[in-house]
Amino acid sequence: MIKFPQKKYEIIYADPPWQYRDRGTNGAAEHYYQTMSFADLAALPVRNIAAKDSVLFLWATYPQLPAAIALIEAWGFQYKTIGFQWIKQNRKSPGYFLGCGHWTRGNSECCLLGVRGKPKRKDASVSQLIFACREEHSKKPAEVREKIVKLMGDLPRIELFARQKVAGWDGWGNEYPDCDTKMDK
């Protein structure tokens, strides 16, 4: 496993590589990146890098909501609300993106908000809704990071399962440029 950072963060932003039962479908995450079981995700030492008063922003698809809330708790946080709701738009044509979904056609994804201790919100004007085009598989809109900083302030922050360097953010993950060790298969 990739070595975890040794410092404390007041903001933790994560887009876990969830495993799904429907691995055989064309949209399966396993076609794009290595996924992790709930047990492996829950075993990550996230609580060790969380400051006494900190906030967790955790992406989850709707079939994963119960597991996502359980993961928030496993990492030492308390679920509070949906922090952000991403309404996916098409890149090449007007209108909304429609995925396959599980019961109904999927269009949106949520980023849950959990707290540890008593973190302070800096700006109460931050909107939950994000209307942005869907890009490559699982890539989230950059606007989310901006809204997190506006909401909470310029605090020590890390993105878990990061794929790119972003100014002001530390990163950790199998695809993060500074990580020289890949996750165990």
Q: Can you annotate each of these PLM segments?
A:
Residues 1-185:
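Class I S-adenosyl-L-methionine-dependent methyltransferase catalytic core
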